[in-house]
């Protein structure tokens, strides 16, 4: 079992950061280690998406159903993949029009203990930098608008 819990205060609205996190189809453009992203179902209340991970010679794919509560949270539940279980939650707490606190919690365990020992380190690295990658994407897109 592994748990990732990260948070950050960012100089952007909760709505803006929520939209970037929910922009899964573009993850390969800005999430380190994400090799593919496919949206399988996209509704107002939820999204089902498949993500490919490829880093340091390790590659795997997983699918989650994401429950959407704009602009406050995105809750992730495993549909399929190499995990025994995987759940996660993004929370966006608006502090002002131009600031919010972002929190990401991911709880998971890989099916295969031996493969999991290697893969878990890579998944931890990616999960631990997700907020940084989202913030960098926000900075890049915000500067293009200014």
Question: Where would I find each of the regions flagged by the language model?
Answer:
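Residue-level preference for beta-strand/loop junctions
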Residues: 2, 43-45, 58-60, 84, ...
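Hydrophobic pocket/interface hotspot
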Residues: 17-21, 27, 49, 66, ...
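Beta-strand/loop substructures that line and gate deep hydrophobic ligand-binding cavities in soluble
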Residues: 78-129
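Hydrophobic ligand-binding cavity/cleft-lining segments
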Residues: 1-44
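Hydrophobic/aromatic beta-strand elements that line small-molecule binding cavities or substrate pockets
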Residues: 6-8, 62-67, 87-94
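Glycine-rich portal/gate segments that line the openings of hydrophobic small-molecule binding cavities
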Residues: 38-79, 133, 137
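Short, highly charged C-terminal tails/helix-capping segments
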Residues: 136-146
């Amino acid at each position: 079992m592994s748990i990732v819990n990260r948070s950050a205060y960012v100089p952007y609205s909760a709505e803006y950061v929520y939209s970037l996190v929910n922009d899964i189809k573009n993850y390969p453009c800005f999430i380190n280690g994400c090799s593919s992203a496919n949206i399988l179902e996209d509704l107002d209340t939820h999204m089902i998406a498949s993500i490919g991970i490829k880093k340091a010679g390790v590659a795997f794919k997983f699918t989650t159903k994401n429950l959407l509560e704009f602009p406050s949270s995105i809750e992730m539940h495993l549909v399929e993949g190499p995990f025994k279980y995987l759940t996660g939650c993004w929370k966006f707490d608006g502090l002002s029009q131009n600031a919010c606190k972002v929190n990401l919690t991911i709880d998971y365990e890989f099916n295969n203990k031996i493969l999991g020992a290697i893969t878990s380190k890579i998944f931890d690295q990616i999960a631990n930098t997700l907020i940084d990658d989202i913030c960098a994407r926000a900075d890049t897109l915000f500067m293009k608008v200014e």
